[in-house]
Amino acid sequence: MLRIIMIPLLILLLFLLFKSCIQKKNQYADVDATQPEMDVQLLDVNPYSRPGTTIDHVNGIVVHYTANPGSTAQDNRDYFNGLKDSHETSASSNFVIGLEGEIIQCIPTWEMAYASNDRNADTISIECCHPDENGKFTDATYRSLVQLTAWLCAKYDLTADQV
C-alpha cells in the first residue's frame, strides 16, 4: 500500500523539480543578451585612468551614474582619457552609456578600471549618463544598460546577484 502511494508522490516531485528548473532557465528569456552595438574608443594606457592591469577573474558588474548630469558618453570618455595629462584623480570605467543609449567602451573587459575602489580588481564597470540632478536614466540609457549587462552576465557566467 505504501509503495502505491510513494510512486505517484515521487512522480509529482520529479515533475515539480523539472518545472522549477525550466522556469529558472526561462527567467531572463525576455531580455536581449546579444552583444550590443558599441563604439570602442580605448583610453590610452596611463596610471590615472587605464593602468593596463589584467583582471584575473570577473566576479561582478558595477553600475554607477556619472557625477556630471547632462554630460554625454563622449564627454565622459574624453574626461577619463584626459586624466593622463591633468593627473587630477584616478577614475575610469570599462563602459559609458550615453543619454541616447550609445555605448562607448573605454577599457577592455579583461583590464581593470578605476571605478569602484575595493572591487576594481574583479569587476567590470558601467557608467550611465543622466540628464539632471535626480540621477534617473533615460529610457534609451536604461535599455542599453539592460542589454549590455545581460550580455556581460552571459559572457562571464554571472548571476543577477553579481550585478
Regions found by a protein language model. Give the residues of each.
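Long, well-ordered alpha-helical scaffolding segments within enzyme catalytic domains
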Residues: 90, 122-163
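N-terminal catalytic cores of peptidoglycan-degrading enzymes
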Residues: 2-117
